From Swiss-Prot:
It comes from the Bacteria. The keyword Signal does not apply. Pfam families: Aminotran_3. One of its GO terms (biological process) is rhizobactin 1021 biosynthetic process. PROSITE patterns: AA_TRANSFER_CLASS_3. Its cofactor is pyridoxal 5'-phosphate. InterPro entries: Aminotrans_3 (IPR005814), Aminotrans_3_PPA_site (IPR049704), Dat (IPR004637), PyrdxlP-dep_Trfase (IPR015424), PyrdxlP-dep_Trfase_major (IPR015421), PyrdxlP-dep_Trfase_small (IPR015422). Keywords: Aminotransferase, Plasmid, Pyridoxal phosphate, Transferase. The keyword Thylakoid does not apply. Belongs to the class-III pyridoxal-phosphate-dependent aminotransferase family. It comes from Rhizobium meliloti (strain 1021). Its EC number is 2.6.1.76. This is Diaminobutyrate--2-oxoglutarate aminotransferase.
């Protein structure tokens, strides 16, 4: 690396401000006030986490006031290796000093070629040998849009099937496939032809039965509706699902349901799209969440962690679906070389340090801790999830129970717990119906001590809540 470039990249000076000099900094309130005055009303996280961040390393972020937080949001699951992993930073510095063009559209480079080989190496055998990849604009929602276009082009059909509670992004087509009504309410007409089926959410069973029956009934309903000539649903261009619903409340799909959906879609010639934007890259204790069921999707959507913390999104699919004409899908920033380099380095570290297995082990520890907390408080209805993608459904024990005897959603209680956790130096998100699920998405490198720190803070928050209610 040239000396002048090395000096610039190692400097903490940005636009004339020394980012590390306390005397040059204003406080959180200063930056939050400026953000409120200048940024869109659509901003969300600063309303729950009122901080201006200065630095980050591993699982820890530090604000401009010098207070540190253990980050169990991690860029909504983007930061598999945590913040600023030294090997990823070194890789980025090497690329910046190499003279490699950073913006290549869909022209190839050695960095891109390696990334494609690396990501294909993570695929199950039934897809790896016949896979094609499309680089998209660098967000998961654009990759979902690309997958929709791919399926419509390949099948000549237009209808789409999604599931209640689904989240696939915020652009027009993706929003049409979202279960949550809130973001759609003021948008008006979305893409027509989207049909929603029950997802196997056993705790709030859509059939009023619960337990293992939920998956069986959901699978039977799905198959009968798609095979019914009087069912009112045209054979769709694709079925899209999450093997673990994330924003929908951290709801893992049972393997028998996933297998049934795969069998039906294969029998009917319907491409199956699995959205692994949040659940992929080892988070659930498998590299892909769908692998627990032993199924092979036709299309896999990836973003978030696949770019090593930088913006990148891809669609991987069976080559027989590749009926696009040249230029049928594009995106100016689909050639993000820094993200591809960071992605390759991230995949290398995940494999070398066995972080997929670590996610499974760490997830079991965290889940066991959460279940112990749940056993001691009436405010937790269920602990669920896989690996380091876990959710705690908060309930209101004073409310009227549902048909299954479960207390109603405790959205206000969940917000209180989230606030208490933030005060204790833990960042975690809420989601699910009415925002009543505490969601934990820490980096895969979280230590046992950090897991116990999170668990201890959560136990203390619920204990304080119980004392106030007594």
């Amino acid at each position: 690396m040239p000396a002048d470039l090395a000096a610039r990249t190692s400097s903490k000076i940005f636009n004339g401000v020394d980012l590390m000099d306390a005397s040059a900094r204003a406080d959180n309130a200063f930056y939050l006030d400026r953000q409120e005055r200048r940024e869109s009303n659509a901003r969300s996280y600063p309303r729950r986490f009122p901080v201006a961040l200065k630095s980050a390393s591993g699982c820890i972020v530090t604000d401009v006031d010098g207070r540190s937080y253990l980050d169990c949001l991690a860029g909504a699951g983007t930061l598999a290796l945590g913040h600023n992993h030294p090997e990823v930073i070194e890789t980025l510095q090497q690329v910046l000093g190499s003279g490699l063009p950073l913006h290549t559209l869909d022209l190839t480079t050695p960095v891109k070629d390696r990334f494609v080989s690396d990501i294909f190496g993570t695929l199950p055998a039934g897809l790896r040998d016949e896979a094609k990849i499309q680089f998209c604009s660098p967000s998961g929602t654009d990759a979902v849009e690309a997958a929709i276009k791919l399926a419509k082009t390949a099948t000549g059909r237009t209808d789409l099937v999604s599931f209640r509670g689904a989240y696939h992004g915020m652009s027009q087509g993706s929003l049409s496939l979202m279960g949550s009504l809130g973001p759609k309410a003021s948008v008006g007409q979305l893409v027509p032809g989207a049909h929603f089926f029950p997802y196997p959410y056993a705790y709030r069973c859509p059939f009023g039965r619960g337990g293992n029956e939920t998956a069986t009934l959901a699978a039977e309903y799905f198959e009968r509706a798609l095979r019914d000539p009087e069912g009112g649903i045209n054979r769709p261009a694709a079925v899209i699902l999450e093997a673990v619903q994330g924003e929908g409340g951290v709801i893992p799909a049972p393997v028998e349901w996933l297998r049934a959906v795969r069998r039906v879609t294969r029998d009917l010639g319907i491409p199956l799209i699995v959205d692994e934007v949040q659940s992929g890259v080892g988070r659930t204790g498998s590299f892909y969440a769908f692998q627990k069921a032993g199924i092979i999707p036709d299309v896999v959507v990836l973003s978030k962690a696949i770019g090593g913390g930088l913006p990148l999104a891809v669609v991987i699919y069976r080559e027989d679906l590749d009926l696009w004409k040249p230029g049928a899908h594009a995106g100016t920033f689909r050639g993000n070389q820094l993200a591809m380099a960071a992605g390759s380095k991230t995949l290398e570290i995940i494999e070398r340090e066995r972080l997929v297995e670590r996610a499974a082990i760490a997830g079991r520890r965290l889940r066991a801790n959460l279940e112990r907390i749940a056993a001691q408080t009436p405010y937790i209805g269920e602990v669920r999830g896989e690996g380091l993608m876990l959710g705690v459904e908060v309930v209101d024990p004073e409310g009227l129970p549902d048909a299954l005897g479960h207390p109603p959603h405790g959205q206000e209680i969940a917000r209180m717990i989230q606030h208490e956790m933030f005060r204790a130096g833990i960042i975690l998100e809420t989601g699910g119906r009415f925002g009543s699920v505490l969601r934990l998405l820490p980096p895969l490198v979280i230590s046992d001590a950090e897991i116990d720190q999170v668990s201890g803070a959560l136990a203390a928050a619920f204990e304080r809540l119980g004392r106030k209610a007594a």
